[in-house]
Amino acid sequence: MSSILGKRKNEEVVSFSPLKRISVEKSLLDSTAYNNSLDWLRSKNFKVSCLLKHFNSKIINDHPLSGSCYTDIGYALINSRKACFILSYRQSLGTAEPPTITFPLPEEDSNGFSGQNALTAFVPSDASDKEPGLLIVMPISGRIAYWTSIGNALAQSYICPQGMESLIKLLPKEKCEHLCCSNPMKFIISTNFGRLFSVQLRDPAGQPDVSVQLFASDISTFSTILQKMKIFNYPSIHIIALKSPPLFSPYQHLLYVAEASGLLEIYDLKLENKLVSGMNLSPIFKQVLREGCPDASGLEVLDLTICPTNGNLVSFLVCWKNSINYRYMIISLDFSDISSPSVMNIHPLYSFSSKSLESSKLHYSSSGNSLFVVLTDAVIIVHVQEDDKDIVSRTSWEEVIRMNTNVSGGIFMSTCYKYVLGKYSIPTESCFIATPYSGIAEIEVHSLEHPANNESLVKSKLEEAVFYSFLPGNPIDFSCNYLRSIKKPELERIIVDLGMDILNSRSTHLPPLFASLMQHLSCRLNSLNNLVRYIRSMSLDVDRQVLYKLRVMGEKCNSVRYLWNTIDTEFSTVSHSLIFQRIIYRLTQSASSDNALREWFLHNIESIDQLIAQAHEFCIDSGSRVQELPLEVLDVIMEANEVILAIQSSALAYRRESQKIYKLSIDTFGEEVPWTSTPETLVLLCRQFELTRSALVQSHQGTSDVENTFKIKDKGVLRNVVSNLEVQLVALTEVCFDAYSERIRWIEQRCGKDASEIQDVKEAFAVNRRFWVQTLSDIGKGSSAIRIAEKYSDYRSLVELCYQLYEDNELTDALNNYLDLFGIKFAFILYDYFVENGMALELLNSDRFNKSYLKQFFKSRDYNQISWMHDMRLGDYDAASHRLLQLATKQEKLVDKKESELSLSKLFLYAVPSNSGNIRDLVLVEQKLEQLHIQKMVSKSVMPVVERLRSQGKKYQLVEAVVDDLIGAKVAPVIARQVMQRVVKKFIAGQVVEATELLEYLSFSLYRREDLVEGEVTDYYLALRLLLTTRLTDDAKRFYENTIWRRAVLHDNWIQVLDTQGKNDAIIETQFRMSALYRTLEAVTINGLFHEGLIRPGSLSSCKFEGYDPQNLISIYPPARFGDVTEVTKVLNRESVKLDHYLTKTNLNTCYISMCLSCDTI
């Protein structure tokens, strides 16, 4: 007895256990096994079911694997180099690891071969109620072992051997390659030399026996001759397929033997294995390729299969190589004329190509309407439709199932079978495949419908990927490249439509309604997440707006899920809920019931935001009965809050938790207004907060009175309701903060930070949040208020709460902790709070608060009243001087304070080492002080008039009365009066007068009484002196100089002054020297103003008003800017006319030259 049949140690002893033993008596078509299988993929035309999820570890680790799957009995026979394994996949129900019988095989001498697995097959039993037999062929030695049943093979280790053995006489370097069952008890074996052997398992009497017979073919005869001549270098013949029609087929007596080169031999097994036809199909195949693929090269036949319904129809799988990849094609031939086959159908595999040549198998479905091309990493289903009238009229299309070899390990086994589950059920067609790491799967074809269009195909494939690609351990590869071929707008529309189908439970891949609505909602939410995960994993080019829309769907689904959970937790039925009865009635117009509520939650997820408005409206309607039914009204408010909080908070929670899925920040939004922060939602949230607060305030104020009207047990209920409302108010505050923050971020993202709309929302948020936080503090939830303020970085509220809740050292410690925690932003808010609340001196208290940010604060704020003191304390006199100068220049309006600030600034400048910047600031300070000095000099002549009129009772219209007194009997133009009124008003208030306005006032001295001017200094001199301290443009300075000199000339009547009749020299000299023009020239010369930049007119005619259009005049002359430019122009023109009159009628120009010479000699 050989080692194959000899007693061996069976390591799988558990296989013999009655509990785990394979039962072949069990019904082979038990539907329970199929119904409980796990679907890896369910498509419209097919589904992929997991029949066995895991092999035994010994099988997985014993590579390479081969084998076959016998669907009649539900067994799998798997071969390796060391053993063969038998297992039943039907008892695993798709998940469990089944009992496995192991048959160790003897080691063989490689004999120069790289090694090959044993050839094995189940042998059908003579009786239907018996186990099948087992046939094992060792490929190198040619030894054959046969057992009439698996039980006998299993008992080989324990009892006397009950098997039979034979031997194939192989030539040197010959090995067995293929094993084919031609009838139940007859098998055909082919070798690498092309020889064929017939193995008969019954003798003529029908008893079990093993007999081997060599086929009488040309190749066999040739091999025999070479053997007798002792020539052993036989040519190797690459037989790729050894196929016979299915058992019980009328054509089963034929055997087709195909070689890779295209050679085909047909044997008739009834005629003692006679060769009836031999041909070379390569010319036919090449002719087909030349018509469709001119660049094809390297034609090779990979496999053949025979149509089970038409034994004359044989399909071949051929491949060829173009410039880049290997391409595949199915060519079907009709062998009605066995010597001259004709081409019936050609189907190139458009959806598959490979860079290297892959081992491939071709299978027909039992109906002949489908072909399965099984490769290592893919299964291609080719659907073939046949016209009943004309067999040549055939169309085909294909479905591709790609396998992830990293998960599955690659397909090593495949077979086809047709089974019927029941008497009246529709026959199904299946292909069974096996992979090392993912077990056995069944591909069941149940439809041959062609997709309506490309978009429907893409949507269906995308939907399949969403529902099945994320199943744990799924070996199918869903990385569909065709998604990138569709246009971007179409793909985005498909994605959004699919999301809506999932959200509204319209997808056919969603499971039937669970008993628990919570599970159904969770399934939909998970599917939406998987849709986004798949889009991200495939790196599809979709716009971010699509992702925002999907995120909104997920938010609403999550909100409904949490809301339903709240209902299930808090209210076991709708009848226990006061608010949901009314809400469902309003929304569905039907009686409130559990089913109505459930139906609404199933089909109205998209309208979940309506519940917020409905809950709030019901609260308002119930509020009118608070005196009659206080507890019921508080319950309604509490339930409404539960609804609103569940919806709003869960939406934000989903957005936060799904950031990794969507790769979208929680602070970014789509173009549409976020549904959780629409203007209507913000209003409703604020009103609900106020409503809850009002109910709490009333309950706190009237607790004792209300409790007296209740029974003892109801008092505890009331306290519990009030406590719950307080907790809800804290949660409502957070929801309101989230909604407003979200609204602000969306407007900033859409319109920018400077949009007018955002300012309105920020102002409303600033007002409301102080109210919300203060409310929490008022009801005794100060710690919660501080927590919320900390969470949302509401620094202003934090500061206010600290001053409300803490005192002295506790307050100092809290503020210092926040300064350390939040840094400069909190510091700025705190410092602003000090200034706004009259606590500015706190900023100078260096012992109490951290001042590390104070310098930066003063740089960013215009608080010069305090910041200069801080700079002075730090010894930064330059900065202190600069701040004082800014304060005096831009902010201060009172004369005395401005003079003090400028004086201090000057003092600080003297304390700083001199540099160019300090010199400029010092000049500016001197000029400002000079302006104030001139103003004070002028006001001294006005204030006595003011005091006199006040003592006379002139309290009303005092300014007009003072101006009238100053003008006296003179006639002044309107613009002169207006300038005087403005200046006098500021004199009375002690305010600073602008330099240009004071210039105008001084230059209008010709319209005031003469007795107002004291001493030798004229107003015109002061005006020129003031002009030197200003920083006007050159044009403006020239205009003012001419105006001042012109009005100084017009101040006196030169016709009278220069009239010498009846005057002696002394009188003439006195009048000449007392003129305003002379005194102004004298004062200017004596005080050196001409050396400081003032230009003396060369002639008085140059002082005329000429060459100014209205626009230029407005830009340089304030009275023209604030008044009527036409009237101002008339006044200036009249002055020029009068000046020209003097120059024409008198020798004023000569006198002016004499005045200049006289002043020069002083």
UniProtKB/Swiss-Prot annotation:
- Gene3D superfamilies (alphabetical): 1.20.58.1380, YVTN repeat-like/Quinoprotein amine dehydrogenase (2.130.10.10)
**Any GO BP annotation:** mitotic recombination-dependent replication fork processing
Pfam families attached to this UniProt entry: Nucleoporin_C, Nucleoporin_N
Where is the major localization of this protein? nucleus
Keyword Nucleus attributed? yes
- What keywords would UniProt list here? Nucleus, Transport
Q: Got any disulfides in this one, which pairs?
A: none
> GO MF terms on file?
structural constituent of nuclear pore
Q: Which GO terms describe its cellular component?
A: mitotic nuclear bridge midzone membrane domain; nuclear envelope; nuclear membrane; nuclear periphery; nuclear pore; nuclear pore outer ring; nucleolar peripheral inclusion body
Tell me, what does this protein do in biology? Functions as a component of the nuclear pore complex (NPC). NPC components, collectively referred to as nucleoporins (NUPs), can play the role of both NPC structural components and of docking or interaction partners for transiently associated nuclear transport factors. Active directional transport is assured by both, a Phe-Gly (FG) repeat affinity gradient for these transport factors across the NPC and a transport cofactor concentration gradient across the nuclear envelope.
User: Mind telling me what this protein is named?
Assistant: Nucleoporin nup132
Q: Which organism is it from?
A: Schizosaccharomyces pombe (strain 972 / ATCC 24843) (Fission yeast)
